[in-house]
Amino acid sequence: MNTIKGKITLEDGAVYEGDLLNGIPYGKGKLTYSDGSVYVGDFVNGKSHGKGKLTYYFGDVYEGEWTNGVQNGVGKMTYTDGTVTEGIFVNGLCAK
């Protein structure tokens, strides 16, 4: 697979900068959502997949594993009030 570096604006207004495969985010990149949230990490077929960090526009931060755009696997959520939740995330929620 030959990826190229590029910058694209998605249909929802989000802006992606990084590796592209056939015009789709694939590899390492940065996705800035229209609300100001920012994901930096791995992409497969246009979705966050692998390891990455999402900083929400309101300040909470999730860092860990992703599967098909959802927090799945080992991760850590740090909330703006300083509370930290670490464990195994399943479909976006900390299971243990």
Where are these regions (language model features)?
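Glycine/tyrosine- and acidic-biased, solvent-exposed loop/turn segments at the edges of beta-strands
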Residues: M1-K96
